[in-house]
């Protein structure tokens, strides 16, 4: 059993994505088939061990992100990106809806050269297909080899939608986003 778990872990890949409030992005990816874990956190800033309060101040340079551990044999990175781009607005600079500030920017922190290339190709394809009414402003960052550290957010920010589905922000912002995801990507839902 332990050997099988080690082999399974070695086959997993990691994606780090910023699509606005991490509670929203976390809630979506927790429902995706082939995703093994989703952790809310921060990336892309200059402060070590940032806190939610510091990041929300807008001066640390960090984006709210999620670290998604997934099995590429079940869901390829390209489909992770498809879900990511379909469940937030990648055309708004430093904001998602009423959440405004650099911490809410759209960002892909590519964990390998292959992810970096795939993110660029995905953006070019979406742009060429005129999927969005405005240009995509998603930041694509080469974070391979630990160049850009991921900092896990405080415990109260983990599993937020699962733990607080009736909370106002969850009911009015996250729930509709999750419903849109579930409708569009029904074939990708966990059983």
Curated annotation (Swiss-Prot):
Write the Enzyme Commission number(s) for this entry: 1.8.4.11
Entry annotated with the keyword Oxidoreductase: yes
Q: What class of enzyme is it?
A: oxidoreductase
* Residue positions of the active site: 21
| GO MF, one example | peptide-methionine (S)-S-oxide reductase activity
Q: Does the keyword Oxidoreductase apply?
A: yes
List the GO biological process terms. Answer: protein modification process
Q: Which UniProt keywords apply?
A: Oxidoreductase
Q: Which reaction does it catalyse?
A: L-methionyl-[protein] + [thioredoxin]-disulfide + H2O = L-methionyl-(S)-S-oxide-[protein] + [thioredoxin]-dithiol; [thioredoxin]-disulfide + L-methionine + H2O = L-methionine (S)-S-oxide + [thioredoxin]-dithiol
Give the signal peptide as a residue range, or say none if absent.
Answer: none
Determine the domain of life of the protein's source: Bacteria
Protein family: Belongs to the MsrA Met sulfoxide reductase family.
Q: What does this protein do?
A: Has an important function as a repair enzyme for proteins that have been inactivated by oxidation. Catalyzes the reversible oxidation-reduction of methionine sulfoxide in proteins to methionine.
Q: What is this protein called?
A: Peptide methionine sulfoxide reductase MsrA
Species, as recorded: Ralstonia nicotianae (strain ATCC BAA-1114 / GMI1000)
